[in-house]
From Swiss-Prot:
This is Ferredoxin--NADP reductase 1. Homodimer. The keyword Transcription regulation does not apply. Its cofactor is FAD.
Length: 348
C-alpha cells in the first residue's frame, strides 16, 4: 500500500500550483484528474488571451496551461489521468481512502480538493444520430480558430461563450450564423452589441431541428425551426458549434457522507481563508472553495493552493514551519538555478 502525504483531486490551476508548492514543502504528492490532460477548464478556451495573472504578460490559455504544467512537474509528483474519484472515506489507520471509478483505492494522509466547478460535460445536441458527426464537423468547443477559416459556421447558443466565439469568428470564417432559442441574447452587453453590429446573421426564437447530410459523414445543411412562426429554414454550412452550457458532475463529496465535509449552496466546500474545510486533513483550493472574500481568479487559486499545502503540512507535522522558504533563497533550487544560468550564458 503506497501512501502519499497529499493527494490533489483536480488538475486545473489550483491543483497544479498545489502540486508545485507541496513539492517545495517536500511532500510526497499525487494528482488525480478525470481528464486526459492537465489544465482544467482553461482547455475550453485555449486561444483566449488571459491578462489577469500577476506577473505574466498576456498569453493564450494554451500557453498558460503549458507553463503551469511545467511548473507543477518541478518536483515529479505522481500523476493519474483519466481517473474519476467517486468517493472518499477514512480507514482505521487514519488514512484517507480515495475510491475511483476504475476500482482503485488511493491512500493519502491529506487531501486537497481542487475540482473547480466540477467535472464539466458539454450539453450535447439533442438530435438522434448527431453524435456520429462529432468526428467531422459537429463541435462542442473551439481548440483552433484557424479550423474555421473561410468556412460557413453556425453557432447554437446565446450565452457569453456563444456570443464571444461568434465575434471571434466573424473576421476569420466566410460567414457566421448564430441561432438562439430565445429572442434576446444573454451574453455580456458589450459583446452582444459588437455582434449585432457585425456581419454575423442571428436567428432568434430558433433551434436546430435537423442535421442534413448526403454523404452521411459530415453535416452539409442545418435545419432551423422558428418556435414563434413555425417557419423552417435550411442553411448550407461547413461547421456546427454547439454551446448550450455544461452539465456538472459534483457527486464527489455527496458520495462521501462519512467525512462530514460542510457544503455551501449544495456544492462548494465551506472553508476558511486558509483553505481549511470543516474536516481536519481535507482542504480546498480554487473555485470549489467558499469563504467571505474568496477571489474567483486564477491568481486567487494560487493563493488557495499555497494555503492548502501549508495547512496539510502542519496537519502531518505540527512542528513544521508555517510556510515554505521563498524560492529566491531556497537551497532546493540551487542546482536548478545553476543550470538556468549556464543555459542563459550559452545562448548569449
Amino acid at each position: 500500500m503506497e501512501v502519499f502525504d497529499v493527494t490533489i483531486v483536480g488538475g486545473g490551476p489550483a491543483g497544479l500550483y498545489s502540486a508545485f508548492y507541496s513539492g517545495l514543502r517536500e511532500m510526497k504528492t499525487k494528482i488525480i484528474d478525470y481528464q486526459a490532460e492537465l489544465g482544467g477548464k482553461v482547455h475550453i478556451y485555449p486561444e483566449k488571451v488571459i491578462w489577469d495573472i500577476g506577473g505574466l504578460t498576456p498569453m493564450s490559455g494554451e500557453n498558460v496551461i503549458k507553463q503551469m504544467v511545467e511548473q507543477a512537474m518541478t518536483f515529479d509528483p505522481t500523476v493519474v489521468l483519466n481517473e474519476k474519484v467517486e468517493s472518499i472515506d477514512k480507514n482505521e489507520m487514519g488514512l484517507f481512502q480515495l475510491h475511483t471509478a476504475s476500482g482503485e483505492i488511493h491512500y493519502s494522509k491529506t487531501i486537497i480538493v481542487a475540482v473547480g466547478g466540477g467535472i464539466l460535460h458539454p450539453k450535447r445536441l439533442n438530435l438522434e444520430g448527431a453524435e456520429k458527426y462529432e468526428v467531422t464537423n459537429l463541435n462542442y468547443k473551439i481548440t483552433s480558430l484557424q479550423r474555421y477559416k473561410d468556412k460557413r459556421v453556425i453557432i447554437s447558443g446565446g450565452g457569453n461563450s456563444a456570443v464571444d466565439w461568434a465575434n471571434e469568428l466573424v473576421d476569420i470564417a466566410k460567414s457566421v450564423y448564430l441561432t438562439y432559442r430565445k429572442d434576446v441574447l444573454s451574453g455580456h452587453e458589450a459583446q452582444v452589441t459588437k455582434l449585432m453590429k457585425s456581419s454575423a446573421e442571428c436567428y432568434f426564437n430558433c433551434s436546430i431541428t435537423k442535421l442534413i447530410s448526403e454523404n452521411n459523414q459530415s453535416i452539409e445543411h442545418v435545419e432551423l425551426t422558428n418556435h414563434e412562426s413555425g417557419d423552417i429554414l435550411a442553411l448550407p454550412i461547413d461547421e456546427v458549434i454547439i454551446n448550450h452550457g455544461y452539465d456538472r458532475d459534483i457527486d464527489l463529496l455527496d458520495n462521501s457522507p462519512s467525512l462530514g465535509v460542510e457544503i455551501k449552496d449544495g456544492y462548494f466546500v465551506a472553508g476558511s481563508p486558509n483553505s481549511e474545510s470543516s474536516v481536519p486533513g481535507i482542504y480546498a483550493a480554487g473555485d470549489i472553495l467558499h469563504h467571505e472574500g474568496k477571489l474567483h481568479l486564477i491568481a486567487g487559486a494560487f493563493q488557495d493552493a499555497a494555503n492548502a499545502v501549508n495547512q496539510a503540512k502542519k496537519y502531518i507535522d505540527p512542528m513544521a514551519n508555517n510556510f515554505a522558504m521563498v524560492s529566491s533563497h531556497n537551497e532546493m533550487f540551487k542546482e536548478r538555478n545553476e543550470k538556468l544560468k549556464a543555459s542563459a550564458a550559452a545562448s548569449v
